[in-house]
Amino acid sequence: MDLPGPIHDFLLVFLGSGLILGGLGVVLLTNPIYSAFSLGLVFVCISLFYIPSNSHFVAAAQLLIYVGAINVLIIFAVMFMNGSEYYKDFNLWTVGDGVTSVVCTSIFASLITTILDTSWYGIIWTTRSNQIIEQDLISNSQQIGIHLSTDFFLPFELISIILLVALIGAIAVARQ
């Protein structure tokens, strides 16, 4: 994707801030449903990072697999849990929380120190991808689509039916 410099920079800053806010939401929100939705925001932002580098198939696969399957499964599992179990004997601050905060703060400080001490001027930033690589990516994703819709159509549909039956079975077992 050939974007002008300021738009490309704005997109990266926007997606990076979405990643940071979503990650903080996963860690800091006490309601597990809200944490799962924040994890979905993180997955969406990660998949959107692939679009400026002309990896559209990877972005679509990331959205389908992580947001469409894994995050929905996490939300599904959290919704079937008893919400009152989370709030019984809720201590405001424990020793484990203190140790975790010290470890995370030290990792964060070392990361910031590394970022500030790195010479970023020697890194070559590329904004346009090579046309040969772009053509290979397009042909590979087209080949995957052709194989899924012709050679592997029956196994692909059988797997989707098996997953649907497993999901219906899980719902039936959870309701009993």
UniProtKB/Swiss-Prot annotation:
NDH is composed of at least 16 different subunits, 5 of which are encoded in the nucleus. Belongs to the complex I subunit 6 family. It is found in: Plastid, Chloroplast thylakoid membrane. Pfam families: Oxidored_q3 (PF00499). One of its GO terms (cellular component) is chloroplast thylakoid membrane. Keywords: Chloroplast, Membrane, NAD, NADP, Plastid, Plastoquinone, Quinone, Thylakoid, Translocase, Transmembrane, Transmembrane helix, Transport. The lineage of its organism: Eukaryota, Viridiplantae, Streptophyta, Embryophyta, Tracheophyta. It comes from the Eukaryota. Its EC number is 7.1.1.-. The gene is ndhG. It catalyses: a plastoquinone + NADH + (n+1) H(+)(in) = a plastoquinol + NAD(+) + n H(+)(out); a plastoquinone + NADPH + (n+1) H(+)(in) = a plastoquinol + NADP(+) + n H(+)(out). It is a multi-pass membrane protein. The keyword NAD applies. The chain crosses the membrane at residues 10-30, 32-52, 61-81, 93-115, 152-172. It is an enzyme of class 7 (translocase). NDH shuttles electrons from NAD(P)H:plastoquinone, via FMN and iron-sulfur (Fe-S) centers, to quinones in the photosynthetic chain and possibly in a chloroplast respiratory chain. The immediate electron acceptor for the enzyme in this species is believed to be plastoquinone. Couples the redox reaction to proton translocation, and thus conserves the redox energy in a proton gradient. GO terms for molecular function: NADH dehydrogenase (ubiquinone) activity; quinone binding. This is NAD(P)H-quinone oxidoreductase subunit 6, chloroplastic. InterPro entries: NAD(P)H-Q_Oxidoreduct_6, NADH_UbQ/plastoQ_OxRdtase_su6, Nuo/plastoQ_OxRdtase_6_NuoJ.
